[in-house]
């Protein structure tokens, strides 16, 4: 599906509403047992931690790695020291599938993140039942409806899920803090234009709160970019660079930069 420039998020959300309308309403099951991401990031704050993403395609890059064996990729991420595996489940724009999350979650011991444009409780139940222990809530998806964001956040927490709350600017970061979110992402990609700049991460650092953990997302392709954010971020979310890596273990290990501000 083609997306008009500047209308990325709008187009995706319109499609997502159609997807949700067809989605069965599942009863939530008990959460899969693994460590808590927040606790892990606090405990291992001496190194920049990597959230490694299973991503076959994206609207900005097109096909990234369609032939990948998703279970082998996920197991390799786990063995290489990823803190969590992010799994894209959007079928239309990212060629993802909820079954990828289900299969990966069955085959790894570490936390899994349902990476999707979540705007409804049905999606949260589905994520939990597919083995996710963390879900993504993107503040930009709730531009004029903070109450809905808060409702979904609290609902996910009530089920035992952790929530990565994604922000892109100061106003959205304020929203995340207002929620009392503990795990906050800063997306270096503008979801309206899909342009990427690490400046997004840098600009928001002065407003960080010591009790939270912060993840820099998008635009991190190697050691150089990782070093730029390592001092102020607990972790990074990396997809394309790892999906295309010739030596996955080395590529992931290289990203785990020693951090100066060890919080122990």
UniProtKB/Swiss-Prot annotation:
Keywords: Amino-acid biosynthesis, Aromatic amino acid biosynthesis, Decarboxylase, Lyase, Tryptophan biosynthesis. It holds the Pfam family IGPS. Its EC number is 4.1.1.48. InterPro entries: Aldolase_TIM, Indole-3-glycerol_P_synth, Indole-3-glycerol_P_synth_dom, Indole-3-GlycerolPSynthase_CS, RibuloseP-bd_barrel. It is an enzyme of class 4 (lyase). One of its GO terms (biological process) is L-tryptophan biosynthetic process. It comes from the Bacteria. It catalyses: 1-(2-carboxyphenylamino)-1-deoxy-D-ribulose 5-phosphate + H(+) = (1S,2R)-1-C-(indol-3-yl)glycerol 3-phosphate + CO2 + H2O. One of its GO terms (molecular function) is phosphoribosylanthranilate isomerase activity. Pathway: Amino-acid biosynthesis; L-tryptophan biosynthesis; L-tryptophan from chorismate: step 4/5. NCBIfam families: PRK00278.1-3 (NF001371). This is Indole-3-glycerol phosphate synthase. The gene is trpC.
């Amino acid at each position: 599906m083609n997306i008009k420039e500047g209308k990325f998020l709008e187009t995706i959300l319109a499609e997502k509403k159609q997807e949700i309308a067809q989605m069965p309403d599942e009863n939530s099951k008990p959460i899969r047992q693994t460590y808590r991401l927040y606790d892990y990031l606090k405990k291992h704050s001496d190194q920049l931690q990597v959230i490694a993403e299973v991503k076959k395609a994206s609207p900005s890059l097109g096909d990234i790695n369609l032939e990948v064996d998703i279970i082998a990729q996920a197991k390799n991420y786990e063995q290489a020291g990823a803190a969590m595996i992010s799994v894209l489940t959007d079928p239309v724009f990212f060629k993802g599938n909820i079954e990828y999350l289900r299969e990966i979650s069955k085959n790894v011991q570490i936390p899994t993140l349902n990476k999707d444009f979540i705007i409804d409780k049905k999606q949260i139940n589905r994520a939990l039942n597919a083995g996710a222990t963390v879900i993504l809530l993107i503040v930009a998806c709730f531009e004029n409806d903070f109450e809905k964001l808060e409702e979904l956040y609290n609902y996910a927490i009530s089920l035992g899920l952790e929530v990565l709350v994604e922000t892109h600017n100061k106003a959205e970061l304020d929203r995340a803090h207002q929620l009392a979110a503990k795990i906050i992402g800063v997306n270096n990609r503008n979801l309206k234009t899909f342009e990427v700049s690490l400046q997004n991460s840098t600009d928001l650092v002065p407003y960080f709160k010591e009790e939270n953990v912060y993840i820099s997302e998008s635009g991190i392709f190697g050691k150089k970019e990782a070093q730029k954010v390592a001092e102020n971020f607990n972790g990074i979310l990396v997809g394309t660079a790892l999906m295309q890596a010739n030596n996955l273990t080395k590529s992931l290990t290289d990203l785990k930069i020693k951090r100066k501000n060890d919080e122990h």
